[in-house]
Design a protein with these regions (language model features):
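Short aromatic-enriched loop/helix-cap "lid" or pocket-rim segments at secondary-structure transitions
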Residues: 67-68, 123, 189-191
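Short gly/ser-rich loop at a beta-strand->alpha-helix junction or flexible surface loop bordering the NTP-binding
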Residues: 93-94
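Hydrophobic, Leu/Ile/Phe/Ala-enriched alpha-helical segments that form helix-helix packing faces
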Residues: 15, 31, 35, 97-105, ...
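Active-site metal-binding core of divalent-cation-utilizing nuclease and nuclease-like domains
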Residues: 43-44, 84-89, 98-146, 152-156
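Non-catalytic C-terminal interaction segments of nucleic acid-processing enzymes
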Residues: 8, 141, 154-165, 169-233
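Nuclease-adjacent, charged terminal/linker segments that flank catalytic cores
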Residues: 1-81
């Protein structure tokens, strides 16, 4: 549910990493039963991913909210699935970042967007934005806490102006890490976030599978200085 959308391969990887399921055959059998009983929905969206894509269904939401006490803030019928796949590819990209950090064994905690939205609805100390995630990593003998934003497509200048205004009002976090989906998006983020009055770091999402999180190259949007993630102040 907290992934919003997830490919069948991503779902298997999440389940295997958490130790909930070690047999792929058993896993597919369980997924098929959940689908047959209306707890999840399966979608084919080749414009977003070649794999089938799953989302929580209304029956699954009711069970998790009423029987498990899982916080939820979204459509009662579950996530909207548009035929053009809008929003799906972004969610799948966030999943890949999450999986990369899980595999690195540096991930201490991951607060997802749904949990953040629920917190922002009721908490006295709210985040300035509904981030994609709030992440804690164990790097170089210390724990690094930051908001994570995955930027897959460019936004209009007015939208970046609005985001800058929100980030500069953030009082509960010291750092925001933007991971760009492409080098072009990374360059655009450097331009749009330059001299922001908040510690915003910009990196490339595709670097994560190739390097340890500690060695991820990031740029400080205030100063344009380049750091390894482990070395940021």
């Amino acid at each position: 549910m907290y992934c919003t959308y997830v490919t069948q391969t991503q779902l298997w990887q999440f389940m295997r990493h958490s130790g909930y399921e070690l047999s792929r055959g058993s896993f597919w059998w369980r997924v098929k039963r959940l689908e047959d009983h209306g707890f999840i929905t399966r979608h084919s969206l080749p414009m977003a991913h070649r794999d089938p894509i799953f989302a929580i269904a209304s029956s699954g939401l009711v069970y998790l909210v009423e029987n498990v006490g899982t916080p939820y803030n979204g459509p009662e019928a579950g996530p909207d699935i548009r035929v053009d796949g809008v929003g799906v590819a972004h969610a799948l990209g966030v999943n890949e970042v999450h999986l990369d950090l899980l595999r690195s064994r540096a991930l201490v905690s991951w607060e997802n967007e749904m949990e953040i939205r629920c917190r922002n609805e009721v908490a006295d100390t709210k985040y300035a934005k509904d981030y994609d995630a709030i992440v804690t990593l164990a790097l170089g003998g210390r724990q690094l806490l930051f908001a994570l934003e995955y930027e897959r497509t460019p936004k209009a200048q007015t939208e970046y102006d609005r985001i800058v205004s929100m980030l500069e009002r953030e009082r509960n976090l010291d750092r925001v890490l933007y991971l760009a989906g492409t080098r072009h998006i990374r360059s655009l983020l450097k331009q749009r976030l330059w001299r922001i009055r908040q510690r915003v770091l910009i990196g490339l999402a595709s670097d994560l599978p190739k390097t340890e999180p500690a060695d991820l190259e990031v740029v400080d949007a205030q100063t344009m200085q380049v750091y390894r993630l482990v070395d940021i102040p």
